[in-house]
Structure formats: structure tokens, C-alpha cells
Amino acid sequence: MATGQANKLTGAVGEFLVAAELCRRGLLATPFAGNVPVLHYDIIASGQSGGHVAVQVKAINRHAWQFDIRKFLDVHMDEDGKRQILGAPQQEPFPELMCVLVVLKKTGQDRFFILEWKQLQNLLVRAYTEYLSKYNFVRPRVPGSFHTALAISDVEPFEKKWAKILDRVPSTLMA
């Protein structure tokens, strides 16, 4: 299991790589240390002609990103504390929030998956619902766990889709 320091380094490297990639594409990108807690973003990218977009970054060294489904879906336990009851999707934490999922590799071989927060939410909620429905909404090992994971293969259609961000912010430079 990764240490707290290793997780912080992974996150920091991911944020700086995303900021650098956005700058290469003509945006002015500013990473924050960690994220802006209330607003849930890690980077603000601004166009040279105005406008900006908030970006949340999630980086990994291995095969899957880890999430708490409650950030994406209202979930609570039934009266006996075993069955999960799935409610409505959570509101987007920041308007038009973009997400960049990063797989850290050797220098120059990193992978970037760019999607809207709502697209990420849809992927996670659909997979979580399908998983729980197989077990009548009672998690087999730890009924009260809200953990979910997203494999690289789940987001491959979003790889290198930088235009999803670039199209939201006016820029005078070509990508």
C-alpha cells in the first residue's frame, strides 16, 4: 500500500504534468497545492483572450483510480446497516468541471484521459449500480464500504481528448 507521502507526490506530479500539457497547448495553467477544497479543482486554465476552465486531476501509478462513490451519488444504508440504498446523483461540485485522469509512466510516456466531471460521474455510478445489483445491494465483504474503482480500460475512449478543455477557453495559439 502506498504511503501518504507517495500519494502526495503522485498527485503533485500529475497536477504539474497536466498544467504543463495545457501550457503547451496555449493556455495559462496554474496548479494549486492539492486542490481548492471547497471548489474541488486542482488547476485553473485561462485562455490568452479570456475565459477559464477548472480542472480536477487524479493521478495513479498503477491500474485503477480509487473513489468514494458518495462524492458522485447519494448513498445511505438501510435500517439494518447492510443494504445500500442508492439515491440521486450528486450535484457537480463546480460548474463545468473538467477532469484529467493521469497514469504516470516513464518520462514522456504518461497517459492522459480528459472528460467532463459529469461523464466521470456517469461511468462510476453505472458501474457501482451494476456491481451492487449483483448482490442485492449488499456488498459481500464490507457492507458499509463506499469504495469504487475505475480501470484504465474504462476511460480509454477519453485518452488525449485535450480539445474537451481547449474548446472551452479561447486561445490565440494553435495546439
Regions found by a protein language model. Give the residues of each.
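Mixed-charge (Asp/Glu-Lys/Arg
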Residues: 1-39, 44-175
